[in-house]
């Protein structure tokens, strides 16, 4: 949603911390928010488990604060240790604002921040850690945990309207806002020279079609379905997967790996997206897919799964093609359609690029966060009642 120009902004320098489980989230997903906070003159901290992305975080003028006991996986004993360590860490920082992210640190951080006496505790829901098709025990756990954590926050920000609708019954009146998600549109765009360079590195000829996906190599990204499609269509296109192995996912070892070129994480992502002729995301769960937004901004035709977090990227048949999750046959048909119909590829690519420029500006999201901090500090209850925004396609 667009930020109201009348929204307040913090009138003094604040001590702001963003909390995530791993440092990769701070460095890649929250880069623009961190930069906006620093540019506004605030003292900014990034709290997470330590990792290889810490130098990139600190290069942005952000102080990284490690929490050794934080892990992505759920473990009662370690999670209790993490809660206690988080509480001590947050209390010692004497923060004005704690902004929590990710399912696990979102829940822990809201409670720890409020108990530590932080004046403003804000949470962004990047995607509920439960899907409608999940077993009721998992859904009950997630929804009850969120309902409890919400009681400890001052404000809730949502990336997609479906998550907001799910949690609306337990939200505080006037204390939530649909902000959508965004990317750095100054960085992501068509890169013809980068396209030539990356395709040459990969040995992909100009007349070959390159189909790719971007993300961690985990099952919930639709790895099995993508590899199956690659195996069946390997004579008609080259398939690639760009992203790191995730050691926390033991189910990632699926078949047909010989049909795909696995490429480790790269930093020249605009060039990588531009090298693709078709972008595929067969994911089962997304908050609001950053990879899809980046592909759209680079003008790449897309096939996405019809799930929350992907539906917000665009309309089926207008900006992209949507297929049911877990449906390898439908995914194959959609990819094959784009391999066959060059005119459709060109039309979807242009429409996706236009959509990205209109709706996916990360600076708008960062400004919405800053205005939310100011409103809570000022005691305003009028900001952020749910309004239909750019990310709402209905």
Roles of regions detected by a PLM:
Residues 54-58, 237-263, 344:
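Short, structured helix-loop element that forms part of the nucleotide-activated donor/catalytic region
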Residues 27-32, 209, 213-232, 293, ...:
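A conserved mid-protein helix/loop that constitutes part of the nucleotide-sugar donor-binding site
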Residues 316-317, 321-328, 337-342:
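Conserved acidic donor-binding segment of nucleotide-sugar-dependent glycosyltransferases
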Residues 265, 284:
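Aromatic "clamp/platform" in nucleotide-sugar-dependent glycosyltransferases that forms part
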Residues 100-106, 125:
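Short His-centered aromatic/hydrophobic patch
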Residues 65-68, 147-193:
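Donor nucleotide-sugar binding/catalytic pocket of nucleotide-sugar-dependent glycosyltransferases
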Residues 301-304, 314:
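Short hydrophobic beta-strand element within catalytic cores of glycosyltransferases
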Residues 85, 189-204, 269, 382:
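A short helix/loop element that forms part of the nucleotide-sugar donor recognition site in Leloir-type
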């Amino acid at each position: 949603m667009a930020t109201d120009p009348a929204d307040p902004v913090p009138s003094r320098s604040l001590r702001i911390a963003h909390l995530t489980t791993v440092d990769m989230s701070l460095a890649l997903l929250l880069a623009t928010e961190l930069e906006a906070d620093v540019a506004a003159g605030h003292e900014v901290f990034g709290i997470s488990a330590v990792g290889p992305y810490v130098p990139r975080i600190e290069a942005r003028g952000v102080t990284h604060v490690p929490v050794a006991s934080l892990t992505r996986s759920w473990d009662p004993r370690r999670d209790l240790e993490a809660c206690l360590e988080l509480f001590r860490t947050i209390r010692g920082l004497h923060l004005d604002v704690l902004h929590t992210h990710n399912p696990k640190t979102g829940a822990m951080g809201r409670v720890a921040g409020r108990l530590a006496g932080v004046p403003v505790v804000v949470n962004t829901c990047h995607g509920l850690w439960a899907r409608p098709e999940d077993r009721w025990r998992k859904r009950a756990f997630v929804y009850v945990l969120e309902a409890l954590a919400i009681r400890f926050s001052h404000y809730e920000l949502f990336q997609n309207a479906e998550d907001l609708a799910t949690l609306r019954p337990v939200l505080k009146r006037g204390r939530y806002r649909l902000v959508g998600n965004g990317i750095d549109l100054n960085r992501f765009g068509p890169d013809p020279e980068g396209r030539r360079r990356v395709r040459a590195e990969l040995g992909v000829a100009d007349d070959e079609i390159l189909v790719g996906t971007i993300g961690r190599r985990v099952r919930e990204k639709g790895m099995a379905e993508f590899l199956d499609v690659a195996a069946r269509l390997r004579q008609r296109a080259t398939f690639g997967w760009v992203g790191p192995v995730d050691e926390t996912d033991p189910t990632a070892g699926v078949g047909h790996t010989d049909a795909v070129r696995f490429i480790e994480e790269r930093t020249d992502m605009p060039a990588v997206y531009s090298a693709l002729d078709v972008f595929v995301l067969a994911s089962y769960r997304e908050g609001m897919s950053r990879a899809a937004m980046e592909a759209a901004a680079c003008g790449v035709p897309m096939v996405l799964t019809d799930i929350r977090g992907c539906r917000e990227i665009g309309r089926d048949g207008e900006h992209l093609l949507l297929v049911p999750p877990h449906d390898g046959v439908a995914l194959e048909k959609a990819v094959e359609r784009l391999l066959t119909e060059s005119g459709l590829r060109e039309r979807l690519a242009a429409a996706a690029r236009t959509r990205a420029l209109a709706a996916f500006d990360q600076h708008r999201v960062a400004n919405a966060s800053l205005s939310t901090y100011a409103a809570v500090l000022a005691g305003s209850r009028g900001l952020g009642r749910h309004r239909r925004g750019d990310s709402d396609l209905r």
